[in-house]
């Protein structure tokens, strides 16, 4: 999870074949429970790609009152339209806000400039996670020293 300054705020390491969507809510819980942030669920705006577009994820984010901007997948749009008026209205989607998602991609791009993170040479997950956290800490300190 990254913030508007391209700094990683929460990290969760998963196997390569694991999907992104099941990790979203635990990652959000880690972020909100951390000492790093003092924002509440009402102050968070979650930007995600279509991988996080599952109806159960949207339902849980609404239940937690987390604002989110996630585009619908093509199959979801087609299914909703096939149901006609019983399909409900489409979820709110603001293109201008969604364009800010590039900060997330830039944060991961900056992180992958570190050779150990980009190439994943480490045999053990804990060692790799340590490298990710070290690189992230150094990136945050460099950003803070510039300001």
Please report, for each region that a protein language model flagged, where it lies by residue.
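Aromatic-acidic/polar surface patches that form glycan- and anion
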Residues: 17, 124-127
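C-terminal domain-tail junction helix/linker
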Residues: 126-147
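Hydrophobic (often cysteine-bearing) scaffold residues that line and stabilize catalytic clefts
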Residues: 20, 24, 100, 130
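Helix-centered, glycine/charged polyanion-binding patches within enzymatic domains
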Residues: 36-121
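Juxtamembrane/interface motifs at transmembrane-helix termini
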Residues: 30-31, 80, 130-131
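Polybasic low-complexity intrinsically disordered regions
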Residues: 1-75, 135-136, 147
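Short glycine/serine/threonine-biased micro-segments
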Residues: 14, 46, 107, 128-129
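Short amphipathic alpha-helical segments enriched in hydrophobics
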Residues: 31, 35, 115, 141-142
């Amino acid at each position: 999870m990254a913030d508007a300054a391209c700094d990683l705020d929460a990290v969760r390491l998963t196997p390569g074949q694991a999907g992104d969507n099941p990790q979203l809510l635990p990652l959000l819980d880690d972020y909100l429970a951390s000492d790093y942030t003092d924002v509440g669920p009402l102050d968070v705006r979650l930007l995600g790609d279509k991988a996080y577009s599952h109806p159960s994820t949207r339902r849980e984010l609404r239940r937690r009152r987390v604002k989110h901007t996630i585009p619908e997948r093509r199959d979801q749009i087609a299914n909703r339209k096939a149901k006609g008026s019983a399909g409900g209205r489409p979820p709110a989607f603001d293109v201008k806000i969604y364009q800010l998602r590039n900060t997330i991609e830039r944060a991961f791009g900056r992180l992958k400039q570190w050779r150990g993170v980009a190439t994943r040479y480490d045999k053990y997950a804990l060692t790799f996670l340590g490298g990710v956290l070290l690189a992230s800490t150094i990136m945050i300190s460099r950003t803070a020293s510039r300001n």
